[in-house]
């Protein structure tokens, strides 16, 4: 039906698992919840009444949704299944659980394509759950994970990405407590209402700008820089069909010149170059001599690149869509978007969100979007920005040459 589901029938009691957030396994206190994180946990729990226990918490990237999940686990005090977007996010959850709760390693297990262990707290991915056996029975063999333990809580990380097959199995889990975590409930397929109907109503939502004003997330400056097509590419664009028009504009080779200029400006910063098209990103990676991280990158290499970036040994990282979701890169302060998934508002928000963890000395994060002027690329860019402009963000619009000239004047006055 698509109506928010408020479960008042009560919940199945899962197997107990006392958890203390903020304490190490030897009882040392290390962390405490921020005021808004505590409020989010209490809004979900509702004092343990039937009005709590299922719903969605919406917080910006960098505001500590994982920590809110752990705070809810402490309140529920039962065995928990956590579903994430990919193996990197899965291992980040495990690392955070072991660092910020009193759970020991033997209590937190990974269930993925590489390792299939089940424990009192099990972290898995949507990908392994939706793996299909060709011609086999059952169709989704890993759905049995939902019944392997008497889970008292299921956490859906990045719940706006919930795949359709998981929608179906979630409909059979209404007797269990369910927590959805997300930075934006925008779905480009228009199925936001199904998230509410299956997980529960929105329990807590904090505006991005409010957290920025309270210094919980970094201030962000957003720029759209418009680049022209060459005369040859303009001719090719004019005769192309609609889908090819976008690709021609989005992969405009002239974006490389402005990209190099921005990188020179931010040579001392940690920079992400983010795009949609692999051939474009491969060319940029080769031109810059910077590593490319994409869907084909093995998990071990992926984690090594993330680690090098976090430690400052790697200043520039070229990334595909794999970096859109649930990737913890706290030191990234600049993102340069060279192409995106058409008019995806959710993707734009997630990409800006990679930068929002508070910076040393209160420095601003800077987000650049490189767009080909008077094309489908510019048209889709305006759609992509809608969610962030509704949150109070403003984009400064530049023609490429004007940006270079203004930047040169600024550098000369330093």
Feature-to-residue mapping (PLM):
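Walker A/P-loop
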Residues: 49-73
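Conserved segment of the helicase C-terminal RecA-like domain
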Residues: 354-385
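Conserved helicase ATPase core of P-loop NTP-dependent helicases/translocases
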Residues: 91, 107-110, 115, 272-274, ...
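Inter-Walker segment of RecA-like/P-loop motor cores
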Residues: 98-138
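Post-DEXD/H (motif II) to motif III coupling segment of the RecA-like Helicase ATP-binding lobe
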Residues: 152-153, 158-223, 388
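Conserved interdomain hinge at the start of the Helicase C-terminal
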Residues: 237-276, 280-286
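Conserved pre-motif I regulatory segment
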Residues: 12-58
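A short beta-strand element within the Helicase C-terminal
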Residues: 318, 325-340, 366-369
């Amino acid at each position: 039906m698509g109506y928010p589901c408020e479960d008042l029938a009560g919940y199945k009691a899962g197997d107990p698992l006392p958890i203390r957030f903020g304490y190490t396994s030897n009882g040392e206190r290390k962390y405490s919840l921020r005021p808004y994180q505590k409020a989010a946990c209490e809004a979900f729990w509702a004092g343990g009444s039937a009005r709590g226990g299922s719903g969605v918490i919406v917080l910006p990237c960098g505001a500590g949704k994982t920590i809110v999940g752990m705070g809810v686990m402490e309140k529920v005090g039962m065995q928990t299944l956590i579903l994430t977007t990919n193996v990197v996010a899965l291992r980040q959850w495990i690392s955070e659980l072991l660092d910020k709760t009193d759970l020991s390693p033997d209590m937190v297990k990974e269930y993925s394509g590489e390792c299939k262990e089940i424990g009192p707290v099990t972290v898995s991915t949507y990908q392994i759950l939706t793996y299909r056996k060709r011609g086999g029975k059952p169709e989704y063999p890993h759905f049995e994970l939902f019944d392997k333990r008497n889970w008292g809580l299921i956490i859906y990380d990045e719940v706006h990405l919930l795949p359709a097959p998981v929608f179906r199995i979630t409909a059979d889990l209404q007797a269990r407590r369910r927590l959805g975590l997300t930075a934006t409930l925008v779905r480009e397929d228009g199925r936001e209402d199904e998230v509410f109907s299956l997980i529960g109503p929105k329990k807590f939502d904090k505006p991005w700008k409010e957290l920025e004003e309270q210094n919980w997330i970094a201030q962000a400056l957003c720029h759209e820089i418009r680049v022209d097509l060459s005369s040859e590419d303009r001719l090719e664009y004019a005769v192309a069909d609609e889908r090819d028009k976008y690709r021609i504009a989005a992969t405009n080779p002239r974006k490389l010149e402005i990209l190099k200029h921005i990188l020179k400006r931010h040579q001392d910063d940690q920079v992400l170059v983010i795009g949609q098209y692999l051939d474009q990103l491969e060319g940029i990676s080769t031109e810059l001599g910077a590593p490319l991280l994409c869907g084909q990158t093995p998990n071990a290499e992926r984690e090594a690149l993330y680690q090098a970036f976090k430690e400052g040994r790697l200043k520039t990282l070229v990334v595909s869509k794999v970096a859109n979701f649930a990737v913890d890169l706290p030191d990234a302060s600049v993102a340069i978007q060279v192409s995106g998934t058409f008019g995806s508002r959710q993707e734009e928000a997630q990409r800006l969100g990679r930068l929002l963890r508070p910076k040393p000395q209160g420095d601003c994060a800077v987000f650049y979007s490189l767009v080909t002027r008077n094309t489908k690329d510019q048209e889709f860019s305006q759609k992509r920005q809608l969610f962030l402009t509704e949150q109070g963000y403003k984009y400064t619009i530049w023609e490429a040459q004007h940006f270079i000239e203004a930047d040169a004047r600024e550098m000369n006055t330093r």
